Amino acid sequence: MPIDNENYKSGVDLLLNKQNCESPNFKFYVEWIFKNLELHQSQNINDTAQYVFNQYVNSKTCLDKQKTFYDAIFKKLSSFTKLPVGAVLPEFEMKKINGDAYRFSDFKKEKVNIVMFYDPLCEHCKTEVPKITKEIEDLEKETNQKVGKLAVLNGNPSLWKDFVDKNNLKDWENVTYKDGDTKTQENLDAFANPKYYILDKEGKIILKTYGYSFVRSQLLQ
């Protein structure tokens, strides 16, 4: 069965039929659905994310009794509508780890590129970043192709260099926001840690999460 909006909506209806925010497994199912949708964003199934939210989450019951859950799903929904798959990551200005100015247009794009946002204090970042940098390094050796790699600090600059040194990021371009700049983070929808954009050679977003198998398949095409 092809992965498209109609098939996905039918599957969602089968799973969530007669359930609501007060049902025992409802939160687990909805979170699982959104995680799965994130992995398949390249299939252009953003309509399904909006459908799940409107049909099953956007209710007075959820808002009153599961406010934290409601807000979390609403935030996930925004990731499907802002900078969707197929959009070109916009131009931005930041600064390098040595303080020099940096423009995204300076980024040398390869066949496949990864833009990663992280905070050194984020527990998920501490485990995911070294794993990903190792996987990307291994993929480059296996396929004999370079991956464009840009790491954006979303946290305290005083922890920056140490995190780069310890997590195999020296081979990446390392940048962070200019002092006082909050607009760029908003424009890039980069408030989550870690957050990833996988881009093609033209800078178009082809995936909004990191997937080893996906990156490998793109390199081998």
Language-model segments: residues:
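Short, small/polar residue-rich loop motifs at catalytic or cofactor-binding pockets
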Residues: 88, 111, 191-193
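Thiol/disulfide oxidoreductase modules built on the thioredoxin-like
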Residues: 169, 180-219
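Generic structural signal for well-ordered beta-strand positions
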Residues: 102-103, 206
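Short active-site neighborhood of thiol/selenol oxidoreductases, capturing the structured segment around
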Residues: 103-133, 149-152
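Structural microenvironment flanking redox-active thiols in thiol-disulfide oxidoreductases
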Residues: 126-166, 181-184
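Oxidative protein folding and maturation machinery
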Residues: 1-102
